Swiss-Prot record:
Keywords: Coiled coil. It holds the Pfam family ThylakoidFormat. It comes from Cyanothece sp. (strain PCC 7425 / ATCC 29141). The gene is thf1. Belongs to the THF1 family. The keyword Coiled coil applies. Residues 180-220 form a coiled coil. This is Protein Thf1. Residues 206-236 are annotated as: Disordered. GO terms for cellular component: plasma membrane-derived thylakoid photosystem II. Residues 227-236 have a biased composition (Polar residues). One of its GO terms (biological process) is photosystem II assembly. May be involved in photosynthetic membrane biogenesis.
């Protein structure tokens, strides 16, 4: 029997695939995501699914927004997936296919689609949701909740701003999918709170960088004070 991978193994694998330094506030985001996915992957009841994939992609994209250089974002995402022995292209594809399957639906239509999926199945995406709903040992996770919220948010973009409405929708989905509504509610509250904190931290960092750039430009500019101008223009 093979020993389970450790968090250290996962982090080592990540930095093997992405050796470049990660900028300041984003480093914590990456390492927390690495640990979160790792702890799920080593759990024997965890089963990969498209909703989880969408949660991973959404979390990465929203928390890594504004990362410089932008080209490194793909490398970092790929390294996160490879460190978890996941195919990054497959994760992206599963997330986009799930979003594409429900794109353009109203919230009511989406809820009907989920309800049908949970009880009867249907197309490939619905069958995978039915497998989740009928699995008594399904390993719920925050990333799954984020993926589910992303689907709901696509159908009704303002849903997150109406707490009562969001709770009502989560209860409806939780009932048919056999999901822990209270956990979902708390996880999504934390997710949105952390996202807001990240937005504020990013704005602060941008202000600091802009101020430093301005200071350097001022230091590099020629001194045009009256004294220096007089000295420059004084006859020999």
């Amino acid at each position: 029997m093979n020993n389970p991978r450790t968090v250290s193994d996962t982090k080592r694998a990540f930095y093997h695939n992405h050796a470049r330094p990660i900028n300041s506030i984003y480093r914590r985001v990456v390492e927390e995501l690495l640990v979160e996915i790792h702890l799920l992957r080593v759990n024997q009841t965890f089963v990969y699914d498209p909703v989880f994939a969408l949660g991973v992609v959404t979390t990465f994209e929203r928390f890594m927004q504004g990362y410089h250089p932008p080209a490194d974002q793909t490398s970092i995402f790929n390294a996160i997936c490879l460190a978890q022995e996941l195919d990054p292209q497959q994760v992206q594809q599963d997330a986009q296919e799930l979003l594409g399957r429900v794109r353009g639906q109203s919230l009511e239509s989406l809820l009907d689609w989920i309800s049908t999926a949970a009880s009867l199945g249907g197309d490939e995406q619905q069958n995978r949701l039915r497998a989740i709903a009928s699995n008594p040992t399904f390993k719920y996770s925050r990333l799954f909740a984020v993926g589910l919220f992303t689907l709901l948010e696509q159908a009704e973009p303002e849903l997150g701003k109406d707490e009562a409405r969001l709770l009502q929708v989560l209860q409806q989905v939780g009932e048919v999918m056999h999901l822990p509504v209270e956990k979902m509610q708390k996880d999504l509250e934390q997710y949105r709170s952390n996202l807001e904190k990240m937005t504020q931290a990013r704005k602060t960092l941008e202000d600091i960088v802009a101020a430093e750039r301005k200071r350097r430009q001022q230091n590099a500019a020629p001194d045009r004070s009256p004294e220096s101008a007089s000295a420059t223009e004084a006859p020999n």
